[in-house]
Amino acid sequence: GKLIKSLNDKHYVIGVSSYDYDEFRTNNDRIVMGAGHGYKILRTEKQKASIENSIAYLLANSNNEPIVRSSVWYAYNVSKRIAFTNKMLWESGDDDYLRNETSFDYSLTEKVTIGLKNTYTKDPIEYNIFNITLGVKF
């Protein structure tokens, strides 16, 4: 999860925490907690982009260490119904962690969305996960 506190139109501070489990990774469990700064690079009616950098602490099965995190997020509303999003996260450490998530979503109605999503992860094992998604707003 992430907490965001705006400082002005462009700058904000963040508090981050995450839990990740992967049975194929040497360190099955990853818990990250930290704080940092975000900057809104671009904000238009159709496009949004942000970059965030933070200092965090990683708790993992075999090693606990301070890390640096950096993420870039970009969203483009191609039309009223079609949206493209890309989120990239890098974390330093004994084993660097990289995750890039790319998705295309199509709104069937105001409350129902279908989409295609690919998540690439390297930690240090590389793999891709492709999903067909269904989203429902309540």
Predicted regions and their residues:
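Membrane-embedded beta-strand positions of outer-membrane beta-barrel proteins
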Residues: G15-S17, A35, I51-N53, N86, ...
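Repeated loop/turn-to-beta-strand initiation elements of outer-membrane beta-barrel proteins
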Residues: K10-V13, T44-A49, V78-F84, Y106-L116
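Residue-level signature of outer-membrane beta-barrel architecture
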Residues: K5, Y19, Y39-I41, Y57, ...
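Detector for outer-membrane/organellar transmembrane beta-barrel domains
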Residues: V32-G36, K40, T44-E91
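Solvent-exposed loop/turn segments connecting transmembrane beta-strands
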Residues: Y21-D29, L59-P66, W90-L98, T121-N128
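Outer-membrane beta-barrel "beta-signal"
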Residues: D105-S107, E126-F138
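Hydrophobic, lipid-facing positions within transmembrane beta-strands of outer-membrane proteins
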Residues: G1, S17, I31-A35, P66-V72, ...
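Glycine- and aromatic-enriched membrane insertion/assembly motifs of diderm outer-membrane
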Residues: G1-Y21
